[in-house]
A protein has these predicted regions:
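Boundary/entry segment of secreted carbohydrate-active catalytic domains
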Residues: 1-19
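Gly/Pro-rich active-site loop or hairpin
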Residues: 38-40, 70, 108-118, 179-237
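Acidic-and-aromatic substrate-binding clefts and catalytic sites of carbohydrate-active enzymes
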Residues: 16, 33-45, 64-74, 145-150, ...
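Active-site acidic/histidine proton-transfer and metal-coordination neighborhood
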Residues: 72-168
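Hydrophobic faces of well-ordered beta-strands that scaffold small-molecule active sites
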Residues: 5-11, 27-31, 56-59, 91-93, ...
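Catalytic domains of carbohydrate-active enzymes, especially glycoside hydrolases
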Residues: 14-37, 86
Length: 277
């Protein structure tokens, strides 16, 4: 996949027809592999048709990289087959935990920003990378409660990236959401990120549900302050692919296309910026 102004869209069943009939044409797609592994029938056929046309990124939900249990190698075997079958070059996961005592929590919960967490997660990431024989990109997640901390979130992420050798999926909206909810400057946070390790970027909408609380929903349009933070981020780093996340509350296709166009416009502007600086 080329890394120049590549703007992708999450592939969801609700908008599958738009991919099939060509009314929407992103540069690549992203899916949660858990939703498509070993899937046959009608939707398996649809998925194969779409992935024959568009490059695919896999963004996992259930690896639970922060859990205390051993890794689920049966799942990893199926995942490895999926990644190879569909020629997936980038696999990402959330920097969170989603299981406890081998029970799925059906949520992505934050990990305490502690040194023992850094050691534990870095070891697990190396094990995953060795098994899959490819790098893993971890995503900075949104969180809504206080997290037991011995270090800042940015130091936590940097330490894991350094110790594990993994890459970073930078979710710009999550930076904005956490900055608003936890009272830090999202621009300063971007300045501290290991931007040379970013494999791709997530952009999405959020919803304000209280004066002091916004939620990363993936069900709203991107707001202007997040576009501005995105623009700032691209000026600080080399070009990478950008993925528009929309998981529900889908607008008309023309509105999704407008968001993709807005992202591409900003990305192309920053390509030109880097070309002359």
């Amino acid at each position: 996949m080329k890394n120049h102004s590549q703007i992708g869209l999450g592939f969801r069943r609700e908008i599958a027809d738009a991919f099939l009939d060509g009314s929407i044409k992103p540069d690549f797609i992203e899916v949660a592999p858990e939703n498509w592994i070993e899937l046959g029938g009608y939707w398996g056929d649809v998925f194969r048709k779409v992935t024959e046309r568009l490059p695919l990124i896999a963004h996992g939900l259930s690896l639970s990289i922060g859990s205390p249990e051993e890794l689920d190698y049966e799942f990893l075997k199926k995942l490895k087959t999926f990644l190879r079958t569909f020629n997936v070059k980038v696999y990402s996961e959330h920097l969170s935990f989603a299981k406890f005592e081998n029970a799925h929590l059906f949520d992505l919960l934050p990990i305490p920003f502690r040194e023992d967490s850094v050691k534990h997660i870095s070891l697990r990431i190396r094990q995953v990378q060795d098994f899959l024989e490819m790098p893993l990109a971890i995503e900075n997640v949104s969180y809504y409660t206080s997290v037991e901390a011995e270090m800042s979130e940015s130091a936590f992420i940097n330490n894991i990236v350094t110790e594990s050798g993994c890459n970073l999926l930078l979710d710009v909206n999550n930076v904005f959401v956490n900055g608003s909810n936890h009272g830090y400057d999202p621009y300063q946070f971007i300045d501290t990120m290991p931007l040379d390790k970013v494999t791709y970027i997530h952009m999405a909408g959020h919803k304000r549900i209280a004066p002091d609380l916004i939620i990363d929903t993936h069900g709203e349009a991107i707001i202007e302050p997040v576009y501005q933070l995105f623009d700032y981020t691209l000026k600080k780093m080399n070009p990478v692919p950008v993925l528009l996340e929309r998981d529900f509350n889908f607008p008309e296709i023309k509105e999704l296309k407008a968001e993709l166009s807005a992202l591409k416009k900003i990305a192309n502007k920053n390509l030109n910026y880097h070309a002359i600086h």
